[in-house]
UniProtKB/Swiss-Prot annotation:
Its main location: cytoplasm. HAMAP family: LplA. This is Lipoate-protein ligase A. Its EC number is 6.3.1.20. Coiled coil: none annotated. Pathway: Protein modification; protein lipoylation via exogenous pathway; protein N(6)-(lipoyl)lysine from lipoate: step 1/2; Protein modification; protein lipoylation via exogenous pathway; protein N(6)-(lipoyl)lysine from lipoate: step 2/2. Keywords: ATP-binding, Cytoplasm, Ligase, Nucleotide-binding. In the transfer reaction, the free carboxyl group of lipoic acid is attached via an amide linkage to the epsilon-amino group of a specific lysine residue of lipoyl domains of lipoate-dependent enzymes. The gene is lplA.
Length: 338
């Protein structure tokens, strides 16, 4: 029986692909060497220890239908679209060696006529007339007996959208956690016109087979054709949950303020594990009682517009004389906290 396994996903859902990756990693035989090829439709993927409110323009992402996905490995935030090809190499220890998987990718690029080198923070770079440009970034995960190396290759990604979603709004956000390092990037299509997902995947597959001097048939994975993956439903539920993608954020503080006709309002949020740990309010309103009640009731609530909306609606029932003002506050918070 071959020690190699090749899996290709035809799903563009990041939560599906990351759930498949995690399940295969947990269940693979220690003597296997696995290559998983996949890609995601519009998604921001963040590292395990990152804060999405700090890393991403969450409001713009929601407006444009861009998903947020937290991976189980470390590293920074990246934007994926169908112009990216994603790869994952897995192996048991002591066989696992990220320099081997890096070399396989370099060999694949070289077979297409692209000379790239490994550089710095787990990147692959090429030399252009205007200097060194990144074409691939990677992250890693290791357990006691196995490890994986996954990353992306920029083929024909919409680089303008990187700034749309990876530069957060100036929200007066003071956050603990890891901040992404921004790099100068380029698409491989600028070096090799006509390159696409199918061609780069074929090159990576061949380099994988050549390195180990073995060949296997690909297993095509889709929501309609899942391999036997015990625990997949639970893993997918986790990957797609608000609790995992947002609730795992490190502690942070957020200040928002505005002025209405009836007075100014300033809210200070301390957020822990995606929930409001403390809320302070300052206002020059002539009727501060409803706003003070709001601050008190927001403690312990999930830090997302839907949960805060529910508190505001309940408060309007308790303070009917202030319904108009509370509705304004509700609409404002729904906008600034996205």
């Amino acid at each position: 029986m071959s020690s190699l396994r090749l899996l290709i996903s035809d799903s563009y859902d990041p939560w599906f692909n990351l759930a498949v990756e995690e399940c295969i990693f947990r269940q693979m035989s220690p003597d296997q060497r696995v290559l998983f090829l996949w890609r995601n439709a519009d998604t921001v993927v963040i590292g395990r220890a990152q804060n999405p409110w700090k890393e991403c323009n969450t409001r713009r992402m929601e407006q444009d239908g861009v998903k947020l996905a937290r991976r189980s490995s470390g590293g920074g935030a990246v934007f994926h679209d169908l112009g990216n090809t994603c790869f994952t190499f897995m192996a048991g220890k002591p066989e696992y060696d990220k320099t081997i998987s890096t070399q396989i990718i370099l060999n694949a690029l070289a077979s297409l006529g692209i000379q790239a080198t490994a550089s710095g923070r787990n990147d692959l770079v090429v030399i252009k007339d205007d200097g060194e440009r990144k074409v691939s970034g990677s992250a890693y995960k290791e357990t006691k007996d196995r490890g994986f190396h996954h990353g992306t290759l920029l083929l024909n990604a919409d680089l303008n959208r990187l700034a749309d979603y990876l530069n957060p709004d100036p929200k007066k956000l003071q956050a603990k956690g890891i901040t992404s390092v921004r790099s100068r990037v380029t698409n491989l299509v600028e070096l090799l016109p006509g390159i696409n997902h199918e061609k780069i995947c074929a090159a990576i597959e061949q380099a994988f087979f050549n390195y180990y001097d073995e060949k296997v048939f690909a297993e095509i994975i889709s929501p309609q054709a899942l391999p036997d993956l015990p625990g997949f439903a639970e893993q997918f539920a986790k990957q797609s949950s608000w609790e995992w993608n947002f609730g795992q954020a490190p502690a942070f503080s957020h200040l928002v303020d505005t002025r209405f006709v009836w007075g100014g309002i300033e809210l200070h949020f301390d957020v822990l594990h995606g929930a409001i740990d403390r809320c302070q309010i300052f206002t020059d309103s002539l009727n501060p009682a409803p706003l003070e009640a709001l601050a008190e009731r927001l403690q312990g609530v999930e830090y997302r517009p839907a949960a805060i909306d529910a508190v505001c609606l309940q408060l309007s029932d308790d303070f009917p004389e202030s319904q108009a003002e509370l509705l304004q506050v509700q609409c404002w918070l729904a906008e600034v906290l996205r």
